Regions:
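Bacterial N-terminal signal peptides
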Residues: 2-12
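Carbohydrate-interacting regions of secretory-pathway proteins
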Residues: 16-21, 33, 37-325
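A glycine-anchored, Pro-Gly-centered beta-turn/N-cap motif
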Residues: 23-26
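Short Lys/Arg-enriched alpha/beta "domain-start" segment
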Residues: 29-31
Length: 325
């Protein structure tokens, strides 16, 4: 009953926030100057909770932030932006008046040279490896049909081709050697949690059950070791690659296990390369020891794959690995 109630509440929350989800994300378009000249403009909009949003707008060499507020109920899907911004002595100040509605961010920017008009469409950039099929020789851990490869934990299940997490971290039944690993994940929309906090769609992919690559809604946030893509307490991503919540993302990981001699003494550290949504965020990073929270603080030549439960509704699908070496 508890599980059914939780599922019902989760689905209700999702349905109520679909239009609010569309108020945030990536937007691409153009701005037209009073002269008729057009130039490209992009925006990344983050939901801050209680109807508040911030649009991080990039045009020419300028990056500005404009705050917005939903009109009426958030689920009605209308956010208004009214703010004056200063772009420095060369460009001057502009009075921004705009709105996001029906997946379009449009409006005007009034400056000393007249009225500029902008229009941007919401886009889902996706990952080039999204939906990638397991190659020959790979071991499929999750194909959307069952949980056979995993040690079953309460409330974990597969629905609509997606593995849903709840209550406990989960690990594979088998241990594996060095590998190429593909994982697809989706973080939940949690606008009332502070951006950049650990409470905004938290989970983790533990390679060998010991080395965590963080999963988190870190859309637009500067890279940190404890945000999405970070190797917890070990390495900061080289660049931002996080997509908005409720959009499927990918990790493509090449992991070389630590090596040991016949006596059990370690002769080489683990090495990891991570691509997040097709972008290299860790390149041959040496891992001298495990990260916290895994199955063991002792290293090994083989290990399980573990997905961390951190009390948030993170979803996984299309998980496979191919042994290497």
């Amino acid at each position: 009953l508890t599980g059914c109630l939780a599922l019902s509440l989760s689905l209700t929350a999702m349905a109520a926030s679909v239009k609010e989800i569309e108020l945030q994300g990536n937007f691409d378009g153009s701005v037209t100057a009073p002269t008729g000249e057009t130039m490209p403009v992009t925006a990344q909009i983050v939901a801050l909770g209680k109807g508040e949003h911030v649009a991080k707008i990039s045009v020419a060499d300028a990056l500005v932030e404009v705050k917005g507020m939903t009109k009426g109920k958030a689920e009605d899907g209308l956010c208004l932006y009214e703010q004056t911004i200063d772009l420095g002595p060369e460009m001057g100040s502009f009075k921004i008046s705009g709105k996001v509605e029906n997946r379009v961010f449009s409006g005007t920017a009034e400056g000393s040279d007249g009225m500029h008009k902008f229009s941007l469409n919401r886009v889902e950039k996706g990952s080039p490896t999204l939906g990638q099929k397991a190659p020959e020789g790979a071991i499929v851990l999750q194909d959307g049909t069952n949980m056979n490869a995993w040690i079953q934990e309460p409330f974990w299940d597969v629905r609509d081709g997606v593995m849903n997490m709840s209550g406990h971290s989960i690990r594979t039944k088998e241990e594996f050697p060095s590998m190429q690993l593909h994982v697809e994940f989706k973080t939940p929309f949690m606008p009332n949690e502070e951006p950049g906090s650990q409470a905004r769609g938290n989970s983790g992919v533990y390679v060998f059950g010991r080395y965590e690559v963080q999963v988190l809604d870190s859309f637009t946030e500067a890279p940190r070791d404890n945000l999405c893509g970070g190797i917890y307490q070990k390495a900061v991503p080289l660049t931002k690659a996080c997509l908005p919540p409720e959009e499927w993302q990918t990790y493509d990981i090449e992991f070389h296990a630590p090596k040991f001699d016949a006596s059990g003494a370690k002769t080489a550290d683990a090495i990891i390369t991570v691509k997040h949504n097709g972008i290299t965020i860790h390149d041959k990073v040496v891992l001298p020891s495990p990260t916290p929270g895994g199955v063991s603080d002792q290293e090994a030549a083989k290990g399980v794959l573990m997905l961390q439960d951190h009390h948030d509704r993170v979803e996984y699908r299309n998980i496979w690995l191919k042994p290497i070496d």
